[in-house]
Amino acid sequence: MELTTRTLPARKHIALVAHDHCKQMLMSWVERHQPLLEQHVLYATGTTGNLISRATGMNINAMLSGPMGGDQQVGALISEGKIDVLIFFWDPLNAVPHDPDVKALLRLATVWNIPVATNVATADFIIQSPHFNDAVDILIPDYQRYLADRLK
């Protein structure tokens, strides 16, 4: 597949997602980094977003709850280039009924080459990057060329 460049803006659009057993871990991480995160636009699946907003007073664009379609909503935003970073604390020890949605979300984040953290250490590396508050170029699939090739 041919690639093109997308510029992640200095003010990132960040999606926050956490499975039930990981919600407290994500909330603690958000509270620890609240001053930095408040400089960006935040999205989250429903329950996670409402819990974070209630605990911190931060403005969160809450989707539906993950099992009710929220993971797919976040995935759609990634596909549309509207999410720049995904912080997704998923529980590797417990299966969830919407596992296919979880896999699809992670697949789309990989396809569209956005930074993804699935644990605290990686989330810390991302947010502490000297480029976190900078505009950064990434390579993404050239969808227009892909579509043109498919329609030949």
Swiss-Prot record:
InterPro entries: Methylgl_synth, Methylglyoxal_synth_AS, MGS-like_dom, MGS-like_dom_sf. The active site is at D71 (proton donor/acceptor). Pfam families: MGS (PF02142). Its EC number is 4.2.3.3. Keywords: Lyase. It catalyses: dihydroxyacetone phosphate = methylglyoxal + phosphate. GO terms for molecular function: methylglyoxal synthase activity. The keyword Lyase applies. GO terms for cellular component: cytosol. The keyword Repeat does not apply. Substrate binds at H19, K23, T45, G46, T47, T48, S65, G66, H98. Residues 6-152 form the MGS-like domain. SMART domains: MGS. GO terms for biological process: methylglyoxal biosynthetic process. Catalyzes the formation of methylglyoxal from dihydroxyacetone phosphate. NCBIfam families: MGSA, PRK05234.1. Belongs to the methylglyoxal synthase family. This is Methylglyoxal synthase. It comes from Escherichia coli (strain 55989 / EAEC).
